[in-house]
């Protein structure tokens, strides 16, 4: 597939594609700086209390607690779960649709090979297949689930694959730390069905993906 830098093969450092050079996208020097900005620009207590319904607040809060795995597994793989999971999904979906990114900004994520393969439309084996990974450069992929991200590199989970996400202003999602059942994760949560453009992939010496650079473009709902 195309995309800037997408026609080149894996170089000596294991890089396919290119890291976007977009200086206007917000990055923060520290987690404290990121938290202060997002509390002022990506969350609003009045909006939370009065614009969202009880079901929407419950859905988002449930995701930040113990239900995130069941909700995303059901959405991404179609696996049935507890009866109340669909209620949480519906509430979180409609609630997050009422929030948008306030500025072009960068967020971060760590994910395992399983969910990275799911996002890229492949198998875990293909996460070490150079031809398959190269074919993803420039492609638009959709996360059928909710995507948890950190607002600073220090708050991103450590996992098999490091994600850097350039989020365009107006993408559906919210800074959930003020209302989270796991405060201190400093999480920005993207709504389900967000579209991402693949800009860069980095692999290790064995050819396995270890880094993914995405651009969050819009939400398909």
Predicted regions and their residues:
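Mono-ADP-ribosyltransferase
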Residues: 6-221
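Hydrophobic, gly/ala-rich membrane-insertion helices/peptides used by toxins and envelope proteins
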Residues: 1-3
């Amino acid at each position: 597939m195309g995309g800037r830098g997408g026609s080149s093969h894996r170089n000596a450092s294991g890089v396919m594609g290119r890291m976007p050079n977009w200086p206007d996208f917000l990055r923060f020097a520290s987690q404290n700086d990121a938290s202060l900005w997002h509390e002022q620009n990506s969350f609003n207590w009045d909006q939370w209390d009065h614009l969202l319904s009880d079901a929407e607040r419950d859905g988002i809060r449930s995701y930040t607690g113990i239900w995130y795995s069941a909700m995303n597994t059901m959405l991404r793989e179609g696996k049935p779960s507890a009866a109340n999971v669909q209620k949480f999904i519906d509430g979180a979906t409609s609630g997050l649709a009422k929030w948008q990114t306030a500025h072009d900004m960068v967020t971060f994520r760590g994910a395992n090979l399983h969910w990275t393969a799911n996002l890229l439309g492949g198998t875990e084996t293909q996460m070490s297949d150079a031809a398959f990974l190269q074919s993803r450069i420039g492609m638009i992929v959709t996360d059928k689930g909710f995507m948890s991200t950190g607002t600073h590199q220090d708050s991103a989970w450590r996992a098999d694959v490091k994600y850097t996400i350039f989020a365009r202003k107006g993408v559906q999602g919210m800074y959930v730390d003020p209302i989270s059942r796991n405060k201190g994760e400093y999480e920005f949560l993207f709504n389900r069905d967000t579209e991402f453009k693949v800009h860069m992939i980095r692999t290790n010496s064995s050819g396995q993906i270890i880094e993914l650079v995405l651009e969050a473009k819009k939400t398909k709902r």
